[in-house]
Amino acid sequence: MALGFVRPARPEDAGEIARIQLTTWRTAYRRMFPAHVLANLDEAYLARGWSEAIGSAPSARHRVLIAVEQGDSASHVVGFAASGPADEQALAPEEPPLPDDVAAVTDLLVEPRWGRRGHGSRLLAATVDLWREDGFTYAVAWAYEQDAATQKFLASAGWSPDGAGRALDVDDMLVPQLRLHVAIDPQPPATA
């Protein structure tokens, strides 16, 4: 029987995180982005970025977590989440800075072949626990308008659109996004 758990990412996880990001983007976004854009994503470049995000985070409130599936004979890194204080990348065009108590999810991906096993939910729950520790009371995340799976996943956890939108320029093609938000209860829900 497999066991899933979440832990803080370590610098040596950067390569696996980059591989998951690349695989997931090429699978989930293949109808959203031009094929040549996805084909030209550089795994080594992504790994260097993740190594820096893990090893030299801008603050103690910037975190990268990984989901691990532990089987009888091996363990596999199957997903990751990155978050921190909401910065300029969390903003809609011409929006003023968000308050200091707002967190932002920058990435939350589970490799498709490991989906539907609770890894995304565990990553999100662990992230919310850390937000509570860090004093965040609100969180935001951007989702592509065509990414129904991410929107449905976040909605199932209580997130909803906040009315903000933007479009990313991907090789002269505008890809619309909408922002979702959630209030963070300062106390975790009671368990039976």
Where in the sequence are the language-model features?
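Conserved active-site alpha-helix within GNAT-family acetyltransferase domains
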Residues: S121-R122, E133, E145-G163
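Short amphipathic helical patch at the helix-1/turn junction of helix-turn-helix
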Residues: V110, Y144-E145
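Hydrophobic pocket/interface hotspot
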Residues: I17, Q21
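Conserved GNAT acetyl-CoA-binding A-motif
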Residues: W131-A143
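Terminal substrate-recognition subdomain of acyl/acetyltransferases
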Residues: A2, S156, V170-A192
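Conserved catalytic-core motifs of GNAT/GCN5-like acyltransferases
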Residues: E88, V140-A143, A155, S160-Q177
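Acetyl-CoA-dependent GNAT
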Residues: P8-P11, L22-M32, L38-G115, S121-A126, ...
